[in-house]
Amino acid sequence: MEERNKTLGEFIIENQQSFQYSSGELSRIINSIRLAAKVVNYKVNKAGLVDIVGAAGEQNIQGEDQQKLDVYANEIFIQTLINREIVCGIASEENDDFITVAGSDNSHNNKYVVLMDPLDGSSNIDVNVSVGTIFSVFRRITPVGTPVTIEDFLQPGINQVAAGYVIYGTSTMLVYTTGDGVNGFTLNPAIGTFYLSHPNMKYSKDGHIYSMNEGNYVHFPQGVKNYIKYCQSEEGDRPYTSRYIGSLVSDFHRNMIKGGIYIYPTSSKAPKGKLRLLYECSPMAFIAEQAGGKASDGYNRIMEIQPTELHQRVPFFCGSYNMVEKAEEFMKNTK
């Protein structure tokens, strides 16, 4: 079978033995995310026609207004994972605490926890900008047969066994890694099937795009300001092109395909950064590294940061390897 005619289901079956633990459970988790993503995609595509755009009148744990689609997507992903009884715990951007999944027999026998941002960039729905889902999978560290604890979730990114994202754009794509490269699958909406469309995705070592909210320039640390000036200077192959959508998944996806760097630094308004380590930065860092890129907080490898809380925030520099290296150089020289 030609690679590009291969479905996601066929790809998972063929590559199951390359998974770190050769587990059917992990394959079922990816399949569950695929199913939930198709349901969410249907709602996203109808967002302008029904009453599911705009704010729901509540705030999540971060104090951010919850969009109606945020709430819907969160429920769909959680219920899909719970109903299939394949995980022992779930953590979401939209929930204050983690969810313990005991299973119908109350055995707590499953081995994996899933962390997710069910609908990244959902504030853009009203203006028809691409949004996405981000997910991360860890093997639990507490004994099987016992309820999960916070320690099962507070693991460094290097412990991830799978990570990925779904981008709901002009086409819907699911991109994921299990530590053996990155592959992208595009949904054929006519038959509801994901097909392998982007095998072995790779960052270029160098890129020509930088992505950040330059409207916050005055609030950025000096190292970031210096890097922006470097990107804009007319030397060598510069100036670089500035492209910023405001949806992490969308900006990351474009930069991985075209070559570039995404930066969400600390600022005087957000001294710890804005993005969450466990269900935004760590999974994207895993994907980036598997695609030959690099991810950092400006000084340290994202994948090696030991989380201390579920909704911990960190600054995020991610993209083409040499671009992130250069940004780190500016940060360290002005520390």
Swiss-Prot record:
| GO biological process, alphabetically ordered | fructose 1,6-bisphosphate metabolic process; fructose 6-phosphate metabolic process; fructose metabolic process; gluconeogenesis; sucrose biosynthetic process
Q: Which domain of life is it from?
A: Bacteria
Question: Does the record bear Metal-binding in its keywords?
Answer: yes
Cell compartment(s), UniProt? Cytoplasm
Q: Which coenzyme or cofactor does it need?
A: Mg(2+)
As to how many cofactors bind and how, the note says: Binds 2 magnesium ions per subunit.
Spell out the molecular function terms from Gene Ontology. fructose 1,6-bisphosphate 1-phosphatase activity; magnesium ion binding
Reactions catalysed, semicolon-separated, are:
beta-D-fructose 1,6-bisphosphate + H2O = beta-D-fructose 6-phosphate + phosphate
Which PROSITE patterns has this protein been placed in? FBPASE (PS00124)
Tell me the pathway: Carbohydrate biosynthesis; gluconeogenesis
Q: Where are the transmembrane segments?
A: none
Q: Which residues bind Mg(2+) 2?
A: D117, D120, E280
Q: Which InterPro entries match?
A: FBPase_C_dom (IPR044015), FBPase_class-1 (IPR000146), FBPase_N (IPR033391), FBPtase (IPR028343), Fructose_bisphosphatase_AS (IPR020548)
- Give the binding site residues for substrate: D120, G121, S122, S123, N213, Y244, K274
Any one of the GO CC terms: cytosol
**Keyword tags:** Carbohydrate metabolism, Cytoplasm, Hydrolase, Magnesium, Metal-binding
Task: Specify which residues bind Mg(2+) 1 according to the UniProt entry for this protein.
Answer: E93, D117, L119
Record EC number: 3.1.3.11
What's the main place this protein lives? cytoplasm
Q: Which Pfam families match?
A: FBPase, FBPase_C
The similarity comment for this entry is:
Belongs to the FBPase class 1 family.
Self-association state and partner proteins as the record states:
Homotetramer.
Name of this protein: Fructose-1,6-bisphosphatase class 1
| Naturally occurring in which organism (per UniProt) | Flavobacterium psychrophilum (strain ATCC 49511 / DSM 21280 / CIP 103535 / JIP02/86)
- Gene symbol here is fbp
